[in-house]
A protein has these predicted regions:
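Short alpha-helix in the alpha/beta-hydrolase fold that links the catalytic acid
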Residues: 69, 193-203
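Acidic catalytic loop of the alpha/beta-hydrolase fold
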Residues: 188-192, 221
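C-terminal catalytic histidine-bearing segment of alpha/beta-hydrolase fold enzymes
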Residues: 39, 205, 210-266
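Serine-hydrolase catalytic machinery in alpha/beta-hydrolase-like enzymes
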Residues: 26-126, 226-240
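A conserved short beta-strand
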Residues: 155-165
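Alpha/beta-hydrolase fold nucleophile elbow
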Residues: 127-139
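Gly/Ala-rich beta-loop-alpha elbow adjacent to hydrolase catalytic centers
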Residues: 138-142, 146
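Short beta-strand/loop motif that positions the catalytic acidic residue
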Residues: 177, 183-185
Length: 266
């Protein structure tokens, strides 16, 4: 029954994508003198302005996975920008390099915000975007970043974190968070243990944030990435694993979340 449901969702998405005229465009922009290389996607057949969504990449860097998610958002009727948080489009091809690149940005929130906000400006300037309706989604490292930007008080309608770590050195303060928050995490993700989830909930409650946390039982880290199992085997990281059910359900939750925060039907 579940396989049948997943197939129906996939077919519906494929049909919608076929009707859309999704365009993709590489863009270069700057933050603090560093060249950043992003990717914009939008439905060229759609008339009028629409919400804009930033896509923040995994710890591997701005790659095809982030671009594919941007195109998927465009097919839903949004204009999406897959940003570059590392600079010059740098990508990591080994976990050691990915960890260092991620740490350099994660541990410097001033730098992270500078590069994130540069992406917001690019997105807002696109002629298809209603610059008052901006959200952000992030995967793994990207999930960390969107939550940190929400904690910093960025003026976003909402953020969605997919299998991102929830710990922070700068907890949200009451009245500071403007964005609504959606956290989608795996119940078998050792990088986001149950105690971390509970700590995050306490943080959000204390700061009076409008948030929701959904845990997918049995889902490992990177459960949305179809290459997760291959990467896990390649680098002997048992924590990685794709989960088709959690992938489909979390994407559907994000769509419902966007309908709510943008107050319009998609």
């Amino acid at each position: 029954m579940m396989k049948h449901w997943i197939l129906l969702v996939a077919l519906a998405f494929a049909a919608h994508t076929a009707q859309a005229a999704v365009k993709g465009e590489e863009v270069q922009y700057q933050a603090g003198g560093t060249v950043l290389k992003g990717y914009l996607a939008w439905d060229d057949a759609q008339k009028g302005k629409r919400p804009g969504v930033l896509v923040i990449h995994e710890w591997w860097g701005h790659n095809e996975y982030a671009r594919e998610r941007a195109r998927m958002l465009a097919a839903l009727g949004y204009t999406a920008l897959a940003v570059d948080m590392y600079g010059d489009g740098k990508q990591a091809h080994h976990p050691d390099d990915a960890g260092k690149m991620m740490g350099d940005v994660r541990n410097d929130l001033v730098l992270a915000k500078q590069r994130f906000d540069a992406g917001v400006r690019v997105l807002k300037k696109h002629p298809t975007v209603n610059n008052k309706d901006i959200a952000a989604i992030g995967y793994c490292f990207g999930g960390i970043i969107v939550l940190e930007m929400a904690r910093q008080g960025d003026n976003l309608k909402g953020v969605a974190s997919f299998h991102g770590n929830l710990a922070t050195k700068q907890p949200a303060r009451p009245g500071q968070v403007k964005a609504r928050v959606l956290v989608l995490t795996g119940g078998a993700d050792p990088f986001v243990p149950a105690e971390q989830v509970e700590g995050f909930k306490k943080e959000m409650d204390a700061a009076k944030v409008n948030y929701r946390v959904i845990v997918y039982p049995g889902a490992k880290h990177s459960f949305t990435n179809k290459d997760a199992d291959k990467l896990g085997q390649q680098f002997n990281i048992q924590a990685f694993g794709y989960n088709a059910e959690a992938d489909q359900k979390s994407w559907a939750e994000m769509q419902n979340f966007f309908k709510e925060i943008f107050a319009q039907k998609k």
